[in-house]
Regions:
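Flexible glycine-/small-residue-rich
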Residues: 61, 192-196, 207-209, 277-283, ...
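Bacterial Sec-dependent N-terminal signal peptides
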Residues: 1-51, 163, 700
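Outer-membrane beta-barrel initiation region
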Residues: 289-480, 599-600, 609-639
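Intrinsically disordered, low-complexity acidic Ser/Thr-rich regulatory segments
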Residues: 117-149, 322-340, 580-622, 668-673, ...
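Transmembrane beta-strands of outer-membrane beta-barrel proteins
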Residues: 215-218, 258, 379, 395, ...
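Interaction-mediating elements
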Residues: 40-369, 478, 496
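C-terminal transmembrane beta-barrel domains of outer membrane proteins
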Residues: 40-43, 346, 419-427, 433-466, ...
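Transmembrane beta-strand segments of outer-membrane beta-barrel domains in Gram-negative
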Residues: 249, 454-456, 460-697
Length: 804
């Protein structure tokens, strides 16, 4: 097991460890003062009142600690952090009886008020008084003591009783007990006696309409209500929802849940109940100021209109342009700017087909996914003169065709000094009249480095098409209901005084579709990157520890051969790399030195191998498949699971057709070294909402990359450990591989395992806190002879090298 050394980075401007220690001392001092001042948590509790400190729930005499029942409790103790009610402590520093206006404060503190008024002015004395008043208000805004409230206790008992009745415990009861203590504190006990649950007995279904009866029977589905099952309100709700969807998706447009009724007998003494399920054949309809019963009928959509440039300001204005495509009318106040052929692919309800609610929802979601419209509104109206024909109107409010974006950021890390970065983008929606999104982005960054000003510039262009673009009819393999999308992207970036001044060119072509609401699939057909290093002469300036290690080898080599021509190696930038390379090649061919000084010999070969990998140009043609599962229903949903698997291969096709190799026997394409590897990544995240605005999260990641055909792994595709989104106790690239403490600036591996657990909570007001533990490491699994044994993953015993 590896524990963080917490040593300050030699490249940082500030001693962050000293700052952290100072902040820790200040926090502990503040905490001590806070607790000392407010140690009496009941100081603002009146003599005839008691503060709630704990709720206890007992089910059939056994204490229940589950959080499931907590949502039914209306009165809860003051929130705590580290088992201390900080918000209450802050509240108790304030005093509700203190003056609330400057005049009241002046009467309470006449000497101070007159002193400020005499020295300065009346206005300043009022401001002085307000500063104390506002400070007192600030303390009082935090949660005060939770006083026992008998009405809330009674309502909580009613809530618990109602809950257990929904679970079929009709004979259950809830008793309460309030324990009052001399220190003005109290606890509340809720004693729940469930008794026996009720079972479903005979189930009778009555359908009052021949049309509905025919749909119900032809569906061939099975009811969720079954004789002998435990009574549960949720089952009845699910059954009602099932039947509602059945009719709404088979042409019964006006059908609602109010037409469904369940009848049960909860008075039987044998803990069984008969169930009557009534499906009404009529609906209430308002006609001429009176309500009449109208039989349900099968509705079909006979007219579809799509207004492509709707806005509230144009409501009621005449539509000047119209285009029809396959029975769908596309209308506009000015001009229809969308190709009807492509926009019609998002309309799943068709003319003269029966109404289906799922197709209405699918149409709305598909139109939203086009990223071309601010809002999408769909309305249905009965066509005058008919009683079963619908007109469908789709109102689309387009986003501005051209939009600009600007992002700026100040950055600092152990990799780069403090600097600034900016990104400017321009988006063109509906670029080719098919709801495409064309985006052009420019990015740049600037910072100071030891080698002078450093900068990076880049440009990216992407075209997102809301359908598949593929030859030979392959575009039809994925149905449009899955919102298929094609993305083409090209980009280039250039660096100066950043690393080896890398120049990169990227071309991407991928396909993405949503298998269902929770599952997404992505296929990267052609994800190709060309990386060229323009300044390899800076290698030993960047990897200075490598140069120090090589100098130590040179010292031993000179001593072993009784010469003094290699040590120390040149510090001259123009000669440094060539001299170091010549020296390493000399050592690699010296069998006598290998026999007498094997450690130094291997160290020189390792440095030479790393130099060749890091400085090498690479062509990286990737074919990848990704599967993502995410059951998060909305942005603020804190109960969800996330899983992603990605499998990638680089260089397989080009490796087969290319027979060329370079001097290092590495396969090349157009004289560029070809990256050939298989890579697979798995990531799983799970979050639980633990109530009281607290969330517990778990994350694990496992990834492996294996080269083949004598290829090396490009540095940019290797795994690293450390950083704010990784193992947070280590800086980026600092950890690993394995149990090695290399002292190198950039450590990478071909296997990575990471796991973390985190508890997030509210401290006070909007101040958030988190407690977390990270564990993991990187290892080498390539089997390379240039890698030390303590950096390799040999078997499960290597997991002992995990850092925490």
């Amino acid at each position: 097991m590896i524990v963080n050394r917490n040593k300050p980075s030699k490249n940082t401007i500030f001693d962050f460890d000293s700052i952290a220690k100072l902040m820790k001392k200040l926090f502990l001092s503040f905490l001590s003062v806070l607790i000392f001042i407010s140690c009496n948590s009941t100081k603002q509790v009146a003599e005839n009142e008691h503060m709630l400190t704990q709720n206890y729930i007992y089910i059939d005499g056994v204490r229940n600690k589950s959080s499931d029942l907590q949502k039914y409790i209306l009165q809860k103790p003051n929130s705590k952090f580290l088992n201390l009610p900080f918000a209450l402590y802050l509240h108790n520093i304030g005093n509700p009886n203190k003056p609330k206006t400057p005049s009241e404060w002046g009467k309470k503190n006449p000497n101070s008020y007159r002193f400020v008024k005499t020295i300065f002015s009346e206005k300043q004395s009022i401001a002085y008084a307000n500063s104390f008043i506002n400070l007192n208000k600030w303390f009082l805004k935090y949660q005060g003591p939770e006083i026992i409230n008998k009405k809330k206790i009674k309502r909580t008992a009613d809530n618990l009783l109602a809950y257990y009745k929904t679970q079929g415990y009709f004979k259950s009861k809830v008793d309460t007990k309030v324990n009052l203590f001399k220190d003005k504190k109290a606890t509340v006990e809720y004693h729940i006696t469930k008794k026996n649950p009720t079972l479903l007995d005979t189930i009778n279904i009555k359908i009052e309409s021949k049309v509905l009866d025919s749909i119900y029977k032809n569906a061939g589905t099975t009811s969720l209500l079954k004789s002998g099952d435990l009574y549960n309100d949720k089952t009845f709700r699910n059954e009602a929802n099932r039947v509602l969807k059945l009719f709404k998706n088979n042409g019964i447009y006006h059908f609602t849940e109010s037409s469904l009724g369940f009848y049960i007998d909860s008075t039987r003494t044998d803990y069984k109940t008969n169930v009557g399920f009534l499906i009404s054949g009529n609906r209430l309809e308002e006609k001429q100021a009176t309500y009449v019963n109208t039989p349900f009928k099968l509705h079909k959509v006979t007219e579809i209109n799509v207004i492509t440039d709707y806005s509230f300001t144009k409501k009621g204005e005449k539509l000047k342009d119209s285009v029809s495509y396959r029975g769908i009318n596309f209308l506009a106040h000015n001009k229809v700017k969308y190709n009807p052929k492509y926009l019609a692919q998002s309309i799943f309800l068709k003319p003269n087909e029966i109404y289906k609610d799922t197709l209405r929802k699918l149409t709305r979601n598909h139109l939203k996914s086009l990223k071309n419209f601010k809002s999408t509104n769909i309305k249905f109206n009965t066509i005058p003169g008919t009683d079963n024909e619908l007109k469908m109107d789709v109102f689309l409010s387009p986003i501005e065709k051209y939009t600009l974006g600007l992002e700026t950021e100040i950055t600092h890390s152990n990799i780069r000094d403090i600097g600034t970065s900016a990104k400017f983008s321009i988006s063109n929606r509906n670029a080719f009249r098919g709801a495409e999104l064309l985006k052009l982005s420019f990015l740049g960054s600037y910072f100071n480095s030891n080698n002078g000003p450093g900068w990076e510039i880049g440009v990216d262009a992407s075209l997102e098409i809301p359908r598949f673009i593929a030859p030979l009819g392959l575009s039809k393999l994925v149905p449009k209901q899955m919102s298929p999308r094609t993305l083409f992207s090209v980009g280039s970036s250039f660096q100066k005084n950043i690393g080896l001044d890398r120049q990169a060119f990227t071309f991407l072509s991928d396909y993405k579709w949503q298998y269902n609401l929770k599952k997404t699939i992505q296929l990267e057909i052609f994800n190709t990157q060309y990386i060229k290093n323009l300044n390899i002469n800076s290698y030993f300036k960047i990897y200075s520890s490598e140069f120090s290690n090589l100098n130590n080898v040179a010292k031993v080599y000179d001593a072993a051969n009784n010469i003094s021509i290699n040590y120390p190696l040149s510090n001259n930038k123009d000669n440094q790399v060539s001299e170091a390379i010549n020296f390493m090649r000399t050592v690699s061919n010296d069998n006598n030195f290998r026999a007498t000084n094997s450690d130094e010999y291997n160290k020189a070969l390792n440095i030479l191998n790393r130099y060749n990998i890091v400085t090498s140009d690479f062509l990286i043609p990737v074919l990848a498949y990704s599967y993502t599962y995410n059951n998060q229903t909305k942005f603020n949903d804190n109960n969800f699971s996330f899983f992603k698997a990605r499998m990638a291969n680089s260089g397989n096709f080009l490796g087969l057709i290319s027979k060329n190799t370079n001097a290092n026997n590495k396969k090349t394409f157009s004289k560029i070294p070809l990256a050939q590897y298989f890579k697979i990544d798995f990531e799983y995240k799970k979050f639980w909402d633990t109530a009281s605005n607290s969330v517990f999260g778990f994350r694990t990641f496992l990834g492996a990359i294996i080269p083949y055909d004598n290829s090396d792994i490009p540095f940019t595709k290797s795994y690293f450990a450390g950083g704010s989104n990784d193992i947070r106790a280590w800086q980026t690239y600092e950890l690993g591989p394995g149990s090695r403490n290399t002292g190198l600036e950039f450590n990478v591996g071909s296997l990575k395992f990471l796991t973390s657990a985190e508890y997030r909570f509210d401290v006070i007001s909007k101040l958030k806190g988190a407690i977390f533990i990270d564990a993991g490491n990187i290892w080498d699994i390539t089997g390379s002879s240039f890698v030390d044994d303590d950096a390799k993953f040999n078997n499960l015993s290597s997991l002992e090298d995990m850092a925490i």
